[in-house]
Design a protein with these regions (language model features):
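Acidic anion/phosphate-binding donor-loop and adjacent secondary structure
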Residues: 170, 185-197
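A short, charged, and often flexible helix/loop element on the N-terminal side
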Residues: 58-87
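Active-site proximal beta-strand in glycosyltransferases
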Residues: 5, 113-131, 159, 180
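A short beta-strand/loop micro-motif in the catalytic core of glycosyltransferases
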Residues: 99, 153-162, 180
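Short His-centered aromatic/hydrophobic patch
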Residues: 100-105, 124
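Membrane-proximal helix-turn-helix segments that form the acceptor-binding/catalytic region
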Residues: 87, 114, 128, 139-158
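N-terminal subdomain of nucleotide-sugar transferases
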Residues: 1-54, 157, 179
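Carbohydrate-associated surface elements
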Residues: 46, 164, 185
């Protein structure tokens, strides 16, 4: 059955129409959904560039921009953007499923799906809090952990891109039995089935 899927990428570091690895990954997931016959509305903080081939029929919704500069100000801006993201999801509903790429400051897609009684599929590509602490600058750690716990606990299913990421996810309360390892992109229609619709 054809579904309307809301794909949420609130990570300001990922230009979803760009050429970096994360950008290509987003495009691959959206293409898989389209190939399966579904309709996708793509919500992203950054698009950048032209619409990639094969994605011309995807509805694109811009999320609030996050200012450059001071990491703490950026984090606060991203946290404050969550209400606006929920409003934009409201404006384009209804959906059959929400698919969110986990980002440091957003649990909006999973909260929205839970509130509206539809499956929420969370794709986790890395232990972002630990990566931020090790390779960049981790600010507002308590808030980042609260966002992660909210997203992980409210997702119908959590897709880990590797066994290592799955192991990390299993260290969080309430994730047992909901983590599935799916490498390099996924067909959201089969993910929805795994979430026991």
């Amino acid at each position: 059955m054809k579904k309307h899927i809301a794909y949420v990428c609130a990570d300001a570091g990922i230009p979803v129409f760009g050429t970096k690895g994360a950008s290509i990954h987003v495009q691959s997931v959206v293409r898989a959904a389209l190939k399966a016959g579904h309709r996708v509305t793509l919500f992203a903080t950054r698009f950048d560039g032209h619409v990639p081939p094969g994605l011309e029929n995807v509805a694109c919704v811009h999320l609030p921009e996050i200012p450059q500069g001071d990491p703490t100000k950026r984090a606060h801006a991203a946290l404050e953007a969550r209400d606006h993201i929920a409003e934009r999801l409201d404006a384009h509903a209804p959906y059959d499923m929400v698919y969110e790429r986990y980002s440091l400051w957003s649990d909006v897609g999973m909260r929205w799906a839970r509130k509206h009684g539809i499956p929420g599929i969370l794709e986790v590509n890395a232990p972002l809090i630990e990566e931020q602490r090790t390779h960049r600058q981790l600010v507002l750690e308590d808030e980042a952990r609260a966002v992660a716990q909210s997203a992980f606990s409210q997702a119908s299913a959590i897709l880990a891109v590797s066994p290592g990421v799955a192991d990390y996810l299993h260290t969080w309360p309430g994730t047992k039995g909901r983590v599935h390892v799916v490498a390099n992109g996924v067909d959201p229609s089969s993910s929805a089935d795994s979430a026991e619709l």
